[in-house]
Amino acid sequence: MDSVKPIVKLEQAGSSNLEKASLLPCHISYDGPAPVFEYFHDKIQISNNTHSKTTVCLRGRELNGEELDLPENYTGQVVLCDDGLENDETSEKEIPESTWCINSTFEKVMLWNRDNMRSSEKDQWKRGVLEWIQFASKVKFNCSLYN
């Protein structure tokens, strides 16, 4: 039997930290370091019988947040990708192997929105997270093939 070569390899990068994940519904062109705490202020928790809402100001704009827990036995991972393209030894027919290193993990996602909390049907970002969770439940991966 021919050995199967993975296209993507997932590695643990030392000890991964448990982080807070946030999803902002906006485009930010800057991709360098940023002093986030200089611009992210006034965290307020408002709770009633049905919802818990977090309100913050980011550079003068009010954002409303809703925290979603990942399902039991699920862990979110922030990965850094090394696509392996700098290796000139691979032929054109050979697909280069990418290595993804787990940088940190998360168990909850804070969804931020400029509007008040909306239902899943109206909020494309919340719907997207819920769809990814459903998708993840259908994906199976046999790690023993690559050991």
UniProtKB/Swiss-Prot annotation:
GO terms for biological process: removal of RNA primer involved in mitotic DNA replication. Signal peptide: none annotated. It comes from the Eukaryota. Transmembrane segments: none annotated. InterPro entries: RNase_H2_suC. GO terms for cellular component: cytosol; nucleus; ribonuclease H2 complex. This is Uncharacterized protein C12B10.15c.
